[in-house]
From Swiss-Prot:
HAMAP family in alphabetical order: Phosphoglyc_kinase
Binding residues annotated for substrate, in chain numbering: D21, F22, N23, R36, H59, L60, G61, K62, R119, R156
Signal sequence extent: none
GO molecular function, one term: ATP binding
EC number: 2.7.2.3
Superkingdom of this protein's organism: Bacteria
Organism: Macrococcus caseolyticus (strain JCSC5402) (Macrococcoides caseolyticum)
Protein name according to UniProt: Phosphoglycerate kinase
Associated pathway: Carbohydrate degradation; glycolysis; pyruvate from D-glyceraldehyde 3-phosphate: step 2/5
Database matches in InterPro entries: Phosphoglycerate_kinase, Phosphoglycerate_kinase_CS, Phosphoglycerate_kinase_N, Phosphoglycerate_kinase_sf
Compartment(s) of residence: Cytoplasm
Primary localization class, coarse: cytoplasm
């Protein structure tokens, strides 16, 4: 199914509604990482060049109370966007009403307007998050065409993506197009050998992803806290490392299904306390003492994973290999990140979330083919699910 892209739309003199993903991390009213804003620029600039009137909207955080509203305004995003575009971005501190409508009606071709956090509509009854039909229809009435560029919420059925799309000719923005191409391509038609690396704390978060990737990938390497549930299922002693007791049978079943594909750690970095300062040693995976816990994969596992990656043509990485926020337990994540970044001739994709943060912190971001902007959306896409935000984009 080929979806419409923004370049398929007639934009001149049109009011172009753009659902962006400006759900950026904030501290004390300041944006701490503007990557999602930067990723939206190609679509916005294209509409400006084509003589469209840009009407941007997005959610930011979870809004349940009036106090949340005070802390989660999109005003700082408008300011940052204005700097990045080097032009005025008009901010309207409302999600509906006369002030917003007259500001939109006064727009000239090439103008840019951002209105307030869509989740302000959740305070009195979750209208945005429950895809309230009236709200979707109202927002749609503000524009002539709709561009959905918010991959980060593509797995949600909200008024601001699916609701609006019900009423208008809808196209993917360039970021959404890129996500469909890379993440969708991995699931549907990867170049082989295809190696997936999964980390993070819990098996329960990634059951669907593991199941689907065992079908489509040639190898699935498992690190992070979730590896210990698999190791326990093999009968190994894991000390007091993270364990999901109720997922041991599932882990056995997955290992049975993926016996030639699943690769688990062979050594671990262990310590007594959940702290960066204790005594640390690297031990073989079947020698974790009862009073210790593993907080990272060991050097031999980094080497093993590096060997498994050799010659890969497609690599997807989702989730850190250890507690990478603590410097002494970041080496596994750093090692894997380096190994992927140094591959020649491979399509390398990071599936958002903590792995993306790790790659950026380490300065490897530009070494990857694609870093997804969607954590949950990437995971659900990798599960092989049809995402409502993508489904609702018009077909070509």
């Amino acid at each position: 199914m080929v979806k419409k892209v923004v370049s398929d739309l007639e934009l001149k003199d049109k009011k172009v509604l753009v659902r962006a993903d400006f759900n950026v991390p904030m501290k004390d009213g300041n944006i701490t990482n503007d990557n999602r804003i930067v990723e939206a620029l190609p679509t916005i600039k294209y509409i400006i060049e084509q003589g469209g009137k840009v009407i941007l909207f997005s959610h930011l955080g979870k809004v349940k109370t009036e106090e949340d509203k005070a802390n989660l305004s999109l005003q700082p995003v408008a300011n940052r966007l204005s700097e990045l575009l080097d032009k005025e971005v008009q901010f309207v501190a409302e999600t509906r009403g006369e002030k917003l409508e007259s500001a939109i009606n006064a727009l000239q071709p090439g103008d840019v307007l951002l209105f307030e956090n869509t989740r302000f509509e959740d305070v009195d009854g979750k209208k945005e998050s429950k895809n309230d039909a009236e709200l979707g229809k109202y927002w749609a009435s503000l524009g002539d065409v709709f561009v959905n560029d918010a991959f980060g919420t593509a797995h949600r059925e909200h008024a601001s993506n699916v609701g609006v799309a019900t009423h208008l000719d809808t196209a993917a923005g360039f970021l959404m197009e890129k996500e469909i191409k890379f993440i969708g391509g991995v699931v549907e038609n990867p170049e082989r050998p295809f190696v997936a690396i999964l980390g993070g704390a819990k098996v329960s978060d990634k059951i669907g992803v593991i199941e689907n990737l065992l079908e489509v990938a040639d190898k699935v390497l498992i690190g992070g806290g979730m590896a210990y549930t698999f190791l326990k299922a093999q009968g190994k002693e894991i000390g007091h490392s993270l364990l999901e007791e109720d997922k041991i049978d599932l882990a056995k079943d997955l290992m049975e299904r993926g016996k030639d594909k699943l690769v688990l750690p062979i050594d671990a970095k262990v310590t007594k306390e959940f702290s960066n300062d204790g005594e640390i040693e690297a031990v073989a995976i079947d020698h974790i003492p009862a009073d210790l816990q593993s907080l990272d994969i060991g050097p031999k596992t980094v080497e093993l994973f590096g060997k498994e990656l050799e010659g890969a043509k497609t690599v997807v990485w989702n989730g850190p290999m250890g507690v990478f926020e603590m410097s002494n337990f970041a080496k596994g994540t750093v090692g894997v990140c380096k190994a992927i970044a140094e591959l020649k001739g491979a399509t390398t994709i990071i599936g958002g979330g903590d792995s993306a943060a790790a790659a950026m912190d380490l300065g490897f971001a530009d070494k990857f083919t694609h870093i997804s902007t969607g954590g949950g959306a990437s995971l659900e896409y990798l599960e092989g699910k049809e995402l409502p935000g993508i489904k609702s984009i018009s077909d070509k």
